[in-house]
Curated annotation (Swiss-Prot):
PROSITE patterns: RIBOSOMAL_L2 (PS00467). Residues 1-20, 224-254 are annotated as: Disordered. Belongs to the universal ribosomal protein uL2 family. Keywords: Chloroplast, Plastid, Ribonucleoprotein, Ribosomal protein. Signal peptide: none annotated. NCBIfam families: rplB_bact. It comes from Nuphar advena (Common spatterdock). The lineage of its organism: Eukaryota, Viridiplantae, Streptophyta, Embryophyta, Tracheophyta. The keyword Repressor does not apply. One of its GO terms (molecular function) is transferase activity. This is Large ribosomal subunit protein uL2cz/uL2cy. Gene3D superfamilies: 2.30.30.30, Nucleic acid-binding proteins (2.40.50.140), Ribosomal protein L2, domain 3 (4.10.950.10). It is found in: Plastid, Chloroplast.
Length: 273
C-alpha cells in the first residue's frame, strides 16, 4: 500500500496520510444499494450504539467468501477499494466465464492465477480444506461452519496459523491470539489479507471521520453528573472514582464482556490476549 503524505498547506492536511494507489470502479452486476437503517438506533429510535450516524452513501460489493468455484482457475483482473471494509478486494475472471470479488491476498498482483478445490497447490490466494494443508500454513478467510463461507481473519492484514490437526478437528491460532478448534473439512484461503499498512493511515481531520459514519466522542469528565458518572465537579475535576466506568456505571477497562457458558467455549483452547 502506498501512503501519501499531504503537504502542510492547511491545518486539516497537516497530519493527513492516506492511500492514493487503489481506486474503485466496481462492476454493476456485483454491487447493490444497501439501506443503512437506524444508524445506531433500535426500532424505537433510541440510541443503542453511540457515535454512529451520517456518513457517505455506499454500494455494497458482493464478496465471494465461500470460494465454491471448485477446480476452476481464475485470473486477477483488478484490485479495488471497498468502502465497506478496510481490506482491498480483487475481481476474479474464472475460466467458465464467472466473475466474482474476493478479498485481496497480500502480494497478489494483476494477472496472478488462483484456484479453489481439494487438491490444489499451497500457494497464495488458493482456497482448500484445512485437512489438505500442511502444519504452519498462514491462512485467512476461514470457515467456522462447513459451506457457510469464511468468517474468521477477514480484516486488513489478518492472518491465522494452522498449528495442529487431530481427529476431526484442526487447531488454529487466530490474529487475536485465541487458539481454537475448527472442523478439518472447513476451507480457508492461503496467505495473509492485503493492505497490511492500514494502521499507518491518518485521516488528518474530523470531517474525514464523519464521512465514515463515525460521530464525535465526548469525554465523560466534561459532562454533567446526570449524563455520566465521571461528570460534575467545580472546574476541571478528576473523575471522582477509583477506576473509570462506562456511562452506565460498569468498569470501563479490562472488564470481560463475553457471555458465560457460551456454546462455543468448548472449542476455545486459549482465550484471546
Amino acid at each position: 500500500m502506498a501512503i501519501h503524505l499531504y503537504k502542510t498547506s492547511t491545518p486539516s492536511t497537516r497530519k493527513g496520510a492516506v492511500d492514493s494507489q487503489v481506486k474503485s470502479n466496481p462492476r454493476t452486476n456485483l454491487i447493490y444499494g444497501q439501506h443503512r437503517c437506524g444508524k445506531g438506533r433500535n426500532a424505537r429510535g433510541i440510541i443503542t450504539a453511540r457515535h454512529r450516524g451520517g456518513g457517505h452513501k455506499r454500494l455494497y460489493r458482493k464478496i465471494d467468501f465461500r470460494r465454491n468455484e471448485k477446480d476452476i482457475s481464475g485470473r486477477i483482473v483488478t484490485i479495488e477499494y471497498d468502502p465497506n471494509r478496510n481490506a482491498y478486494i480483487c475481481l476474479i475472471h474464472y475460466g467458465d466465464g464467472e466473475k466474482r470479488y474476493i478479498l485481496h491476498p497480500r502480494g497478489a498482483i494483476i494477472g496472478d492465477t488462483i484456484v479453489s478445490g481439494t487438491e490444489v497447490p499451497i500457494s497464495m490466494g488458493n482456497a482448500l480444506p484445512l485437512t489438505d494443508m500442511p502444519l504452519g500454513t498462514a491462512i485467512h478467510n476461514i470457515e467456522i461452519t462447513l459451506g457457510k463461507g469464511g468468517q474468521l481473519a477477514r480484516a486488513a492484514g489478518a492472518v491465522a496459523k494452522l498449528i495442529a490437526k487431530e481427529g476431526k478437528s484442526a487447531t488454529l491460532r487466530l490474529p487475536s491470539g485465541e487458539v481454537r478448534l475448527i472442523s478439518k473439512n472447513c476451507s480457508a484461503t492461503v496467505g495473509q489479507v492485503g493492505n497490511v499498512g492500514v494502521n499507518q493511515k491518518s485521516l488528518g481531520r474530523a470531517g474525514s471521520k464523519c464521512w465514515l459514519g463515525k460521530r464525535p466522542v465526548v469525554r465523560g469528565v466534561v459532562m454533567n453528573p446526570v449524563d455520566h458518572p465521571h461528570g460534575g465537579g467545580e472546574g476541571r475535576a478528576p473523575i471522582g472514582r477509583k477506576k473509570p466506568t462506562t456511562p452506565w456505571g460498569y468498569p470501563a477497562l479490562g472488564r470481560r464482556s463475553r457471555k458465560r457458558n457460551k456454546y462455543s467455549d468448548i472449542f476455545i483452547l486459549r482465550r484471546r490476549k
